[in-house]
Amino acid sequence: MRQRDAVRQIACSVLFMLLIGAAAAQAAGTDVADAARRGDRDAVRAALARKADVNAAQIDGSTALHWAAERDDLEMADQLIRAGARVTARTREGVTPLQLAATNGSASMIDRLLKAGADPNAPLTAGGDTALMMAARTGKTDALRVLVEAGGNVNAKETWGGTTALMWAVSEGHVDAAKLLIGAGADVSARSNYVAAANGRGFEGRTPVASRTDPKTEEFASGWLTPLTLAAREGDVEMARILVNAGADVNAVAGDGKTALALAIFNGNYDVASLLVDSKADVNKADAQRFTPLFYAVDRRNMETAPNFPWMVTADPMPLIRKMLDAGANPNALVNNTPRARMREGSPRIVFATALMRAAFAADLDLVKLLLERGADPKILSRDNETMLSAAAGLAFIHGYHRGKPPEERLQVVKLFVELGNDVNWHDDYGITPLMAAANYGSVPIIQYLIDAGADLSAHDLGKKNDGAFGSSNEPLMPIDYAIGVGTFVPNNAVIIHQDAVDLMAKYMKERGIAHTTSECTLRGFSCSQVKVDPKVATPGEIVRARKFATGHQIEGLTGGLEAK
């Protein structure tokens, strides 16, 4: 046993000494790289005089020439190249001196490396990025010119996203770089790779597919971008003008079907959109979700404000809307969909039939009048048979979330649609009436107007608008229930009580002998707890305080009409 331990100790000692020796040899062998890393030209010169290996790499694979390129030290680079430095050397991550020079946008360093044998078209990353692409990102035209004159391919695509050097210049807003590339023959209508919705970026192991040439698009797909769509997305008017003048296709569509015009409007870049309309962009081209440029402009005029959308506070697309209508935009183009951004933010479904319905939902009186003047049909129904009146009255409107005009203006919009023939007692496919929509919104003057116009206080919905979600129930509800908050459209079961609206409707129901038939259990939010509340005499506040919430489903034992135990 002792002999075995002694042998093991000797072996460990020998191994340790070998490692120390190897480390010392490594340190001694990287004198040139170490000196270059420090930027010490004298030390580099001295090491080379001692015949130190000019290509010896540090532990990460960096050579002296890498450090010279990184530091943009031309004198040191010349010295190393004369001593035989390999310009194609790669670090362990695959980085070459040319990649570092291109990232810096150093024309002189790029020129030195190219003359020493570097390939201007070599893929410098695993994704196939070239020096021209990297230089384009810096915007330094002298660096680009050196690469182009050395034979750099201006239309080469990196292999992951399929982008070109021109796309990189456009995305970064480098106008002069874009001009140089276009002058050198860059394709202004080149496309990036198409990314199917099921193969979207951000999912592990999934990458864009090869660029497509067929016109098929799909909802929620991405990619398939052109330099012009990138300029539209970034809001770069000058860049967009350069590309249009160079012959870019103004109607090319991205993977989700958006044209540059739609993409500009979607991002609030109305100056670019105006330029594209002037350039004969198709103002009626719908994307894969059926949204037209006109709809996006109407939506953005009244879109929910968020910190990451500062332009929503200041920019007004109304002049653009007028320009698109003048250019032939169809105000009756059927959309029958909900904007994706609204769905992703947790807002309930509200299906907009046309741009007019979106304007009605926001109670944007000026915009509603403009669209009507230009031929918008006030009687078009959504796919759920919802009317313009219901949208204007407050269908699915969430206070504190949705952006709309003041109640006084909303009342004027409601009156307008009633005068145009919208039925005050129309039931949509969920049984919801305009009065229920108004009760959800909670404006007493609007409710009063609809009651005076003949709205039915005894109406019942079909109990299926939310399928038990959002704090609602599956029991048919009355208009007053929407004011109480039972028919809420608010996510996370938040309760919004409109006490004045409840009082007004209760008064009329009492005068007209209309019974409030909704069960106690439903009024208390699915929960038949030990707390007893008589919904026929209790105030809405007392009812709500007694509510116990079930999130997204019914409490066990409560089914169908949610009858109270």
Model-derived regions, located:
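N-terminal secretory signal peptides that target proteins for export/translocation
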Residues: 1-8
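Bacterial N-terminal signal peptides
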Residues: 11-22
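N-terminal segments that cap or nucleate solenoid repeat domains
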Residues: 26-67
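Ankyrin-repeat boundary/"N-cap" motif
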Residues: 28-34, 57-63, 90-96, 123-130, ...
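Ankyrin repeat A-helix N-terminal signature
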Residues: 34-38, 67-73, 100-106, 134-140, ...
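Conserved ankyrin/ankyrin-like repeat signature
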Residues: 43, 75-76, 108-109, 142-143, ...
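Ankyrin repeat domain, specifically the short helix-to-loop turn at the C-terminus of the second helix
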Residues: 48-53, 78-86, 111-119, 145-153, ...
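Leucine-rich solenoid repeat scaffolds
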Residues: 468-527
